[in-house]
Amino acid sequence: TEVIAHLIEKYSKETDFLEACIKSGKELGGYFALSIINTDRPDEIIAMKKGEPPLLIGRDEKQNVVASDTRAIALYTDNVASMRNGDIALIRKDSIKIFNNGERVEREFKPIDKEEMTTDKGELLPNIMKKIVSGDKIA
């Protein structure tokens, strides 16, 4: 992962951050799903996907988020879109722009079926995982 950061830093000296991420992604071999934040622009996320690893974008009226799993994103948003191979997204609080092969593309956002992710007590599974990790007892 340090290699990726160094590549982005190298290209950032000659172009903007999004283009630096695009150029860096072209040099990376194998499959990846990345979420990149620039400390100079903490209100932006660059999401990049190559190959099979899952990468999702969630959106609602208040925020846009990125995660690799629907259950992780379900606590923060109600709608989700799957990124496709080669997608690069520029995500801000109030906007999402997705590109593939240099062209702007649209991805379909679908409602998350939170019912299938709940326990018999009606609690979202990510909440249960938080309790397990934090050491809370589950009766």
For each of these PLM feature ranges, what is it?
Residues 1-139:
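Conserved short alpha-helical segments that host acidic/polar catalytic motifs at enzyme active sites
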